[in-house]
Design a protein with these regions (language model features):
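Active-site-adjacent beta-strand/loop module that shapes the phosphate/pyrophosphate-binding cleft
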Residues: 50, 146-149, 243-265
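Short amphipathic beta-strand and strand-loop transition segments with alternating hydrophobic
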Residues: 123-134
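Glycine-aromatic micro-motifs
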Residues: 2-125
Length: 319
């Protein structure tokens, strides 16, 4: 099992090798292991194991694995086992999102400043029950809970639902020498589900932060995948909950400095993810014009264009 074997490394059969561990009797585990790429093997003593491909990349380093994956693996496995009623192909498709939303939950443990707002913590909420009311690529959880009120009392027991997603990296590519930005356009299900007359959106580059990946690395990867663009550097803009009343998704926003192409339009996206993306390279003034007209009508794009407006002179001066 090599060091880069991922969150759930599988053993490789080697002559004379030994593996210490606990044999699981969890009935759903074989399907999860198969979805993770495991091959079922029956050993001479009748023990069934699932093995991975022999990539000849060396021995597995437990300490390195624990540092990167130790906190993610147990809750992610529990989530996978909860999805084991699905066909293997469906479960395999869901695994990256399961890992990503587990990683986002762990990232949320790092507290943000509380200079004005209350510093009352997560542990002060009295959780009565938590159920998963929908399991799909995304997840919906239903909570029954009581929380502290500002007068010092506890609230009545309330039932609330939350849509559980992963964290995301958002990037606005900007060429300070040409004073141009790159936007992407694609069909979006949120506007379609709302009944929007035009469910194609102009947006910054954006995408899921995979488990074990930094927000910065995700930002660079998404620019390559969605726009065919290699960034020169990143400037952190801000981070925030995009809709804290009902959604767990958390955004990490960056300005990506790059040399943008001369062509105004292009086509990009990963065919494996059924992406159909058109890119637009716009002068900064034109980008601000579509904010004024309302054609730019999603929060990340508007927020980041206003940030660029405030920082544009500095960026152009140092380009």
């Amino acid at each position: 099992m090599p060091d880069d074997a991922g969150c759930f490394p599988l053993p490789v059969l080697r002559e004379g090798a030994a593996l210490r561990g606990v044999l699981s009797v969890e009935p759903a585990l074989p399907k999860v292991l198969e979805a993770l790429g495991g091959v079922r093997r029956v050993l001479p003593d009748g023990v069934v194991i699932y093995t991975g491909a022999d990539t000849n990349t060396g021995r597995w380093n437990e300490a390195r694995w624990r540092a990167r994956w130790g906190a993610i693996a147990p809750p992610a496995l529990a989530d996978m086992l909860g999805n084991a009623d699905q066909p293997v192909t469906v479960l395999r498709h869901r695994i990256p999102m399961i890992l990503a939303r587990t990683a986002s939950r762990i990232a949320a443990r790092v507290p943000q400043p509380a200079g004005i707002r209350s510093d009352t913590g997560h542990e002060s909420v009295e959780l009565v029950s938590e159920t998963i009311s929908h399991r799909g690529f995304f997840q919906t959880r239903t909570y029954r809970l009581r929380h502290p009120r500002f007068d010092g009392s506890m609230s009545a027991e309330v039932e609330r639902e939350v849509f559980v997603a992963s964290d995301a990296a958002i990037v606005l590519p900007y060429d300070p020498q040409r004073d141009r930005v790159l936007l992407i356009e694609q069909f979006r299900l949120g506007p379609f589900g709302r009944g929007d007359a035009r469910p194609w959106m102009l947006e910054p580059v954006a995408g899921r932060i995979d488990a074990g990946e930094s927000a910065e690395d995700a930002a660079r990867r998404e620019c390559e995948e969605e726009a065919g663009l290699t960034l020169e550097s990143l400037e952190f803009v801000t981070s925030y909950y995009c809709s804290p009343g009902c959604l767990t998704e958390y955004h990490y926003c960056y300005l990506g400095l790059a040399q943008l192409p001369e062509v105004n339009q292009g086509h990009a996206g990963l065919s494996t993810e059924h992406e159909d993306i058109r890119t637009h390279v716009l002068p900064f003034d034109k980008a601000m014009e579509i904010v004024a007209t309302g054609e730019a009508d999603n929060a990340p794009l508007i927020l980041m264009l206003f940030w660029l407006q405030a920082n544009r002179a500095r960026l152009r001066r140092t380009a």
